[in-house]
A protein has these predicted regions:
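Expand to "…catalyze enediolate/carbanion chemistry for C-C bond making/breaking, isomerization
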Residues: 1-111
Length: 111
């Protein structure tokens, strides 16, 4: 974190991307704290501020829509809302629900 301004000053960069889980672990925090701990919020804001000051796009992994909205309000302009596995699972649950199931049961196959 002390070098974030120097990192943002590297010629040719268009943006930077924050991985909150990696950042939390590097700060000695647990994953449950990756978007709630005051030290994490300060770090995230510091990174976003350094990117903005350097004219870079600041990106972050949010993991869900609510966190994504909160990160957009903090100034992040590129936000991933889910991993591939999260998106596939949610999509499958929605399709099962639409087909008459509740999305929580395992597929039984043909009987």
């Amino acid at each position: 974190l002390p070098a974030v301004a120097d990192i943002c000053a590297v010629p040719g960069l268009a943006g930077i991307y924050v991985g909150p889980a990696d950042l939390a672990i590097s700060m000695g925090l647990g994953l449950a704290e990756m978007t709630t701990a005051p030290a994490m919020i300060d770090a995230i804001d510091s990174i976003q501020g350094a990117a903005a000051a350097a004219g870079l796009v600041a990106g972050i992994h949010a993991g869900d829509g609510r966190t994504g909205k909160a990160m957009a309000q903090r100034g992040f302009r590129m936000i991933t809302l889910a991993s591939e596995s999260q998106a596939l699972r949610r999509g499958a649950q929605d399709h099962l629900r639409d087909a008459g199931g509740d999305g929580s049961q395992d597929a039984k196959g043909y009987n």
